[in-house]
Amino acid sequence: MSSYVGVLVSDPWLQSQFTQVELRTLKSKFVSNKTQLGRFTVGDLPPVFEKLKAFNGTIDEDEIKSVLDKSYPNADDEVDFEFFLRAFLSVQARGVEKSGGSKGASSFLKTSTTTVHHAINESEKASYVSHVNNYLRDDPFLKSYLPIDPATNAFFDLVKDGVLLCKLINVAVPGTIDERAINTKKTLNPWERNENLTLGLNSAKAIGCTVVNIGTQDIAEGRPYLVLGLISQIIKIQMLADLNFKKTPSLFQLVDDTQDAEELMGLAPEKVLLKWMNFHLKKAGYEKQVTNFSSDLKDGEAYAYLLNALAPEHSTHVALETKDPTERAKKVLEQAEKLDCKRYLSPKDIVDGSANLNLAFVAQIFQHRNGLTVDDSKTSFAEMMTDDVETSREERCFRLWINSLGTATYVNNVFEDLRNGWVLLEVLDKVSPGSVNWKHANKPPIKMPFKKVENCNEVIKIGKELRFSLVNVAGNDIVQGNKKLLLAFLWQLMRYTMLQLLRNLRSHSQGKEITDADILNWANRKVKRGGRTSQADSFRDKNLSSGMFFLELLSAVEPRVVNWSLVTNGETEEDKKLNATYIISVARKLGCSIFLLPEDIIEVNQKMMLILAASIMYWSLQQQSDTESTVSEDATDDGDANSVAGEISNLSIDGASESSPTVQDQELLTKADNDEDEVDGENNKDA
């Protein structure tokens, strides 16, 4: 492994806010000031921050002091490095807000890892508010607060308690949140409000939103650029939901051969939308190619051709004959109204080239009339799609997990986007800082196949250094898109990350390795100490399908979080589904960042059961760290009080390393390797 050791931060969310270069720079500033001052306090921060290049004169010392006073009123509080980083983020947010978000444009189109830099204009705000008014107007709880006036800040006030956020997520991806878990009283206390916001943010991650720079406090304070940046992502996911082949098989009409079909399946939804638009424009005689949702649509001509092609019954040449762009845009929107497309944008937005609103408008046209038919001659393309439900479900889980880490590259399809090795290197650098030697990495776009192999060989090399089970696996397997091997690698990577998080809670583990058995033992002991009777023999225990064990575990770590009047006995399939859905929402409400589906619990997916239990364990132990508890919650049966450190260290059964491959890992990789050998017995792999 590279001798370089990155700057480590115990809080993974905080770690994700900075690059290693930024962390090293800030660490150096922190250490030098602490050395110079001896005792580094909140009161010492303003002059230190003012001199940082990151702020470059955008915010002065008095303003910095004002920002810090709101969050940290006691100027005598001593500052540690993580405190220093959090304070830096608070000041940075104020600086960006002051400059009008000049560091970057709105990222409704591009998924940026730096949501703090969103700058939403008033037109976009009005469109998002209109969207909320339209889709949530009949909601039993929210209807008394709607419609919202976009000319006021009422929207930012309404979003503060988290209810609207949760409801909008369920509109975008129905069933994501069990609404029984949402606190919906007229007046919520701070705890209940924070639960809703935590549920909302963790659920946003679970549908594909990038929220690495957004915390519950940001939403509770109603910070406009952060709130609208998140809302825009949720709306984008809703608007593009049908841009895939499972929901719209007729999209195969856009391709001519197998290679085109494979490429289209790997495209981001917005790219598919552009391809769809160009497909119809070409048929309509439009000679240009639309490559973006901004400048290429400014003159309104492409819209006029598109609507004439999709709705010949409303066809008119008036828009095309109109010379003034604004007048043409008006005619386009009038024609769209006849298709029942509610206006996401104004004529001015078209002329100005508002990428976000144009994307939403084109997506809405697609939803109302896509102009495609099922072509029997292309049914073979549909057969290319995986029928393996488990594989599809795992791909979804790993894709969402990777995107939640805040990597620079957004993943739309695991099996396509990871084949050049670059994203895997980004993920490895996130979960094991300093493990990647970037001098040996090839950055996309990569045209030469051997460069992709080099990246993937580096991925395998690092995986072996992290003690993953990678027997007979070579970088070329990833490049070739071996699904089973890739999923097996990603599972080990996710498991390694979770176990490292637990291990890094040194006040509990004393730096000792954590095993799968430790997690199971901890969960069983926790449930027993909570006065409940459920126990799990393993993470394959079929009794887990009822959901009772995890509900009792959640109740044991936080008694108030489970409403037992909503829990079923879990005997029928319907009852199991109700419990499983509730478990996921309650865990997210508690603070667990998880990506499983109810089916994973009902079918007892061993891997997801381990991650769920580990996530609950991590949350529980974090709370003990925060309160600096010195007495173990899991005292031994004879009543002796153990140290908190003993809660984990005394659980060890076999002393195995957390990164040693499990039997399941070996089975997965052996099976995947054998399957590959059947396909290509002559493929030589590196040991």
Swiss-Prot record:
InterPro entries: Actinin_actin-bd_CS (IPR001589), CH_dom (IPR001715), CH_dom_sf (IPR036872), Fimbrin/Plastin (IPR039959). Residues 7-74 form the EF-hand domain. Residues 122-239, 267-370, 392-498, 513-621 form the Calponin-homology (CH) domain. GO terms for molecular function: actin filament binding. Keywords: Actin-binding, Cytoplasm, Cytoskeleton, Repeat. Expressed in mature pollen. Residues 392-621 are annotated as: Actin-binding 2. Residues 628-687 are annotated as: Disordered. The keyword Cytoplasm applies. Residues 649-667 have a biased composition (Polar residues). Pfam families: CH. Its main location: cytoplasm. Residues 122-370 are annotated as: Actin-binding 1. GO terms for biological process: actin cytoskeleton organization; actin filament bundle assembly; pollen germination; pollen tube growth. It is found in: Cytoplasm, Cytoskeleton. Disruption phenotype: Delayed pollen germination and inhibition of pollen tube growth due to the disorganization and redistribution of actin filaments. SMART domains: CH. GO terms for cellular component: cytoplasm; cytoskeleton. Interacts with F-actin. Cross-links actin filaments (F-actin) in a calcium independent manner. Induces the formation of actin bundles. Stabilizes and prevents F-actin depolymerization mediated by latrunculin B (LatB). PANTHER family: FIMBRIN-5, FIMBRIN/PLASTIN. Cross-links actin with a constant of dissociation of 0.71 uM. This is Fimbrin-5. It comes from Arabidopsis thaliana.
